[in-house]
Curated annotation (Swiss-Prot):
The lineage of its organism: Bacteria, Bacillati, Mycoplasmatota, Mollicutes, Acholeplasmatales. Zn(2+) binds at C132, C135, C152, D155. The gene is adk. Its EC number is 2.7.4.3. It catalyses: AMP + ATP = 2 ADP. This is Adenylate kinase. It comes from Acholeplasma laidlawii (strain PG-8A). Coiled coil: none annotated.
Amino acid sequence: MKTRMIFVGPPGAGKGSQAKIISQTLNIPHISTGDMFRTHIKGSTPLGLEAKKYTDQGLLVPDDVTNQMVKDRLSQKDVEKGFIFDGYPRTPDQAIFLDNLLMVTNQKLDVVLNISSSDEVIVKRITGRRTCPVCGAIYHVDNYPPKVAGICDNDGATLVQRKDDQKETIIRRLSVYKEETFPLIKYYAHKNLLMDVDGNQPLEVITKHVLEILEQK
């Protein structure tokens, strides 16, 4: 069973959902860059304070800061049996850093899962999201609606659509993703690590396909 993996894919393709499911199924940590940033920023670590300078301005955190957070995370005991990266690496430079980091500890990546979805499916998925401003619960108008339309099941707050979930923002993010990530996809394809997964399918079908890939020798 492959246990050291990376999930890549455009926003809304479902890579985060799959990473969480596989993490629970295989009992290995799901390492999301967003979670790493939040943990360091909340803990006011030197890396967190450095990252905050950029996130507060809506800028990407520089590679050297992100890479050091990854190095710190991979030094923890819970990654010995495997790990799932979600949102990292973002560029070939980060991928090379990760390769070298794993080499030092006699480890290597098993597979890179590219969850791809059509722009139309992604736009429909994301624009349907609604978030509770109080508890942070996420719903979807079609796929996971609240019991009462527009109202959070947990606290009765009125659900909102985040700016990030609006159509214009999504189209812009998809364009940036394609431009930024194509070199990374090419890098892993060249190393024969890339496996494509059709993200247009239902969640459970995607999970089944992912598990089949992980079980291949």
